Amino acid sequence: MRIVSVKQGVAPISSAIANAYIDFSKMTASIVAVTVEGPGGRRATGYGFNSNGRYAQPGLLAERFVPRLTEATEAEITGADGGLDPAGAWAAMMRNEKPGGHGERSVAVGVLDMALWDAAAKLEGVPLWRLLADRYNGGQADEAAWVYAAGGYYYPGKGVDQLVEEMKRYLGMGYSTVKMKIGGAPGTALKQALAEDLARIEAVLKLLGGDGSRLCVDVNGRFGLHAALTYAAALRPMNLRWYEEPLDPLDYSTHATLAEHYGPPIATGENLFSMLDARNLIRHGGLRADRDVLQFDPALSYGLVEYLRTLQMLVEHGWSPRRCVPHGGHQFALNIAVGLGLGGNESYPEVFAPFGGFADDVPVADSRVRMPDIPGIGFEAKNALYAVLKTLD
């Protein structure tokens, strides 16, 4: 195997939406195309991009990680079976990188890792979910993945009525579980935000027939302990599907305190970018393996190579892969969920286009989606996204 070329670019995903911590007015994403050549001159091009919430990384890609990948020897990136070995390529990209400090570096590596897995599956002529099931899950792949519609962002002029209409659209698309932002738009005082959020939540619950198990709420890490506990007391009677990222992701001891006082499920992890950070959360965050949800995003956390290490760590600590529901809302994580038996995957039906969402002709029914039989990740079956990725060719 050899790397023929690596091309990169930056795509805008800017929007006027906001969560409790940031707005997305200047958000960007890196896109890459990695062409590899196998035995007999057979070639495949894999594509990658980073999930929303972290910006494009053209500098890190150009200065460190693309050169290392293109300089990798054939032996380094060829597996024992003669196919492309993403783990070997990952090791080449991370050569001479010190441990720790997993912020933006993990995003750059994750973008390339996604493309390498796409290419690896294409060379095998199989969907990525099938390749993963065969290599790492005893050949067992789920027939469908549970997915939920993430939205409910703050937006100028968007009131409760507009929020309910948005959620109604998601239900019409086949989603039975939805997620909305809470914690107030950036700059909103928390005391004001709580009153507004309770009205917003109650309106959505009414739409859902009062069934809290169909609603997730997401703080995006804005709260300290006092605010997290105040919201927890108000949310507890609602029996929500989960209370997401109420605290700074690295504040493990405060997570443990919250878990002592809030019995229903807590979800977190999307902003932890390595197996070691994930392990610290499991060791010190007080999370409960029978109910809490882990949202590590393989596209942001050094890619699937590192995510496989995270899954192994979880098993060693008594956690099932079914407790993992990755952040990101894209086809890469969906393939991983189906192939490795995770608990589901996020979806963005109306935001972060064209990167969010799944293949064009794949319907969602009762918050479940089946996988198309397309080699690789399946970007070619999502026309708007494929058009962006093809600009690199």
Model-derived features: positions:
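Structured beta-strand/loop patches that form or line metal/cofactor-binding pockets in enzymes
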Residues: M1-R54, P58, R64, F355
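Metal- or metallocofactor-binding catalytic centers and their adjacent structured scaffolds
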Residues: E37-G40, A44-E124
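Conserved, mostly hydrophobic/aromatic
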Residues: V32, R43, L112, G125, ...
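Shared catalytic-loop signature of beta/alpha-barrel
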Residues: L250-R368, P372
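Metal-dependent enolase-superfamily TIM-barrel catalytic cores that perform enediolate-based chemistry
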Residues: G138-A256, H261
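Glycine-rich, aromatic-flanked loop segments that form ligand/cofactor-binding clefts
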Residues: E104-V107, D113-P156
